[in-house]
Amino acid sequence: MRGHIVVFARAPALGTGKRRLARDIGDLAALRFERQMLARLLRRLGRDRRWHLRLTVTPDHARHRKHLWPRAIQICGQGRGDLGQRMRRALAACPPGPALLIGTDIPALGPGHIAEAFRLLGRYDVVFGPAVDGGFWLVGARRSSCLPPLFGKVRWSGPHALADVLANLPPHVSVGFAPRLEDVDDGGSFHRLATHRGF
C-alpha cells in the first residue's frame, strides 16, 4: 500500500507568509525563498512512485490559482480552524493507511527522509520529525483513519510545540522519531542554511 504525503503550504504572496523571516531579510527575499522551497520540495518528492503526494494550501481559494502549482499534483484547501485543526483534518482526509504531513521550509528534506518516516510507521503508531527549534517538520500516523489526539493545547511557533504535541498522546500510542532537521523561520536560520543549500 502506497503511503500518502500531505504538503502543508501557504500560497506564496508578498507580505503574507514567513513573517519572522521577512522581518530579517525583507519581504521580497522571503517570498523568493518561499517559492523556491515549495518548487524544490514538490520536484524532489512529487515524482517518486513510492507515495502519493497531495498539496493542501491556505487560503483555500488559492487552490484555483493554477499558475502557482504544478499540474500533476492534487491540490485542496486547508479549510477553517487553527493550525492544529487544519493539520488534523488534512491527515484524516487521506485514504486509509500510513500518512505524513510536512511543511515546506526544511531545505535538507529529501526522499530518503520520507522513506525513513514511512519505515518507522511500520513499527510505531505515530512518527515525528523533530526540528532544531523545538517544533517538528513532519508528523505522521500509521492509520490516517484512526488518528490519536495530537494538536490540542499546543504552543505553536515556539520551542515547546513538539513537547506539547507529545504530551497530548495517550500512553498506549507508540512514537517513532525521524532525524532532527532545521527549518528556516528567521534570518539566522536562513543565512546558516543558505551557505550549505544554495538558496
Annotated model-derived regions:
Residues 65-98, 158:
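Short phosphate-binding loop-to-helix
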Residues 1-21:
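N-terminal nucleotide-binding beta1-loop-alpha1 segment
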Residues 100-102:
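Short aromatic-hydrophobic micro-motifs that form the base-stacking/packing surface
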Residues 145-166:
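Short, glycine-/small-residue-rich phosphate/pyrophosphate-handling segment
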Residues 163-199:
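Conserved alpha/beta core of the MobA/IspD/sugar-nucleotide pyrophosphorylase nucleotidyltransferase superfamily
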Residues 51-59:
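Short beta-strand/loop segment that forms part of the nucleotide-sugar
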Residues 32-51:
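A short, N-terminal amphipathic alpha-helix
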Residues 109-135:
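Conserved donor-nucleotide/metal-binding helix-loop-beta segment in metal-dependent transferases, i.e.
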